[in-house]
Amino acid sequence: IILYMIDFNQFPSPCYIMEEELLRKNLCLIKNVADRAGVEIILAFKSFAMWRSFPIFREYIDHSTASSVYEARLALEEFGSKAHTYSPAYTEQDFPEIMRCSSHITFNSMQQFERFLSDGGGRRK
């Protein structure tokens, strides 16, 4: 166990403090597991969206998830890759931007798929 003596009074409050060395150690472990298992790890913005750390994450993880148009845009513009997007509900207004910012889109139902992507015969609009 590594213990650090940090004077937390030196930081403004509230703020987030990230220890880069430990983050990299954990990301290295995650990447090693993914490589050995032959899988891709996807960063979920719901649990972690500290966008200033995205350059570090990009060294270890290639993709992210999004559950809104804003997260999809964050994935493309700040993380640097299109998102794997899932949302229980999409709007006609947001869907073109979701498509622009996403590499994968998961629908909640066949009705939702047909509403946004199908011409009614299962073919893409």
Language-model regions: role of each:
Residues 3-4, 22, 71:
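Active-site anion-handling motifs in enzyme catalytic cores
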Residues 3-18:
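Generic N-terminal amphipathic, Lys/Arg-enriched alpha-helix
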Residues 27:
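Short amphipathic alpha-helical/adjacent loop interface patches that line ligand
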